[in-house]
Amino acid sequence: MLNEGLCCGAWAMKGTLLLVSSVGLLLPGVGSCPMKCLCHPSSNSVDCSGQGLSKVPRDLPPWTVTLLLQDNRIHWLPALAFQSVSLLSTLNLSNNSLSNLAAEAFYGLPHLRVLNVTQNSLLSIESSFAHALPGLRELDLSSNSLRILPTSLGKPWENLTVFAVQQNHLLHLDRELLEAMPKVRLVLLKDNPWICDCHLLGLKLWLERFTFQGGETDGAICRLPEPWQGKALLSIPHELYQPCSLPSQDLAPSLVQQPGSAPQDAQKSHENSSGQQDPLECEAKPKPKPTNLRHAVATVVITGVVCGIVCLMMLAAAIYGCTYAAITAQYQGRPLASARKSEKMGSKELMDSSSA
């Protein structure tokens, strides 16, 4: 009997533990919280900021919607780094040591809306980044070491409304990249060493249309060339830009035609401090201004009309002159004929008198 009682008690305890475990799995507020993190089930947020973490914690609660990982030492994000928190909506990775953003690290986050990666050491982002986060609305890449951004994202970033890249090392920004963000309403570009040459004309044209349609931007301030140093890109007239030409095999591709500068007869090669040619500069051959066919046709028509009018006026003047001369001659001829007739009659009378 005693053994049977002990067996029954053991089975009852196991059943209770199993029930408690099942309830713990079903309740979103119950579960493990990563060490050095603060979990707030009421707001579905996990705060792991300022804990000296070198990697993303593994045991994050599946109910996490907001994840704060700023002020750590995270330098690398593995593939599917956040697969355990598929409901994640806001991710803060600012002030870490990230040098690259791999698209694979963000796979499995269809609900991510806000991504903050400011104050890292980012050198570039992958062109497939938009594929990994199609629902992203705010992307902040400020205060990094970005020197170049992808020309194209491969597909439109349909939902992005905020794009911030201020305080980086960007020299140029391709217009095609911004055109892939049809819903963007805020673009932050300040504090980059923008080279306002022919390569930045596309960005200027895009910004003009963007601001005209109600978009907001802090503008791009030129670092080079010297005549435009410190001036806003939008304030430089279009006429000072020369179209960029494709680099020739016989000519060094490191030369640049600066806005407002006269074309050079001989190209001069420029090398950077390492002795290599700078691929960011190119010589733009001046092209003749394209002829406007409509203006040419109008000029020809107007010239023809003017010439026709002049010819008609000359013809009218000639006719008038001839008519006037004929009439004048006719009136002047009558008195002369009468005088001659009178003279003849007088001579005849004189002869008749002499004969008599």
Curated annotation (Swiss-Prot):
Give the Cytoplasmic compartment stretches of this protein: 321-356
Q: Which residues are glycosylated?
A: N92, N116, N159
| Compartment(s) | Membrane
Q: Which UniProt keywords apply?
A: Glycoprotein, Leucine-rich repeat, Membrane, Repeat, Signal, Transmembrane, Transmembrane helix
Q: Where is the signal peptide?
A: 1-32
- What transmembrane ranges does the database entry give? 300-320
State the name under which the record lists this protein. Leucine-rich repeat and transmembrane domain-containing protein 1
| UniProt source species | Mus musculus
Q: What is the lineage of its organism?
A: Eukaryota, Metazoa, Chordata, Craniata, Vertebrata
Primary gene name: Lrtm1
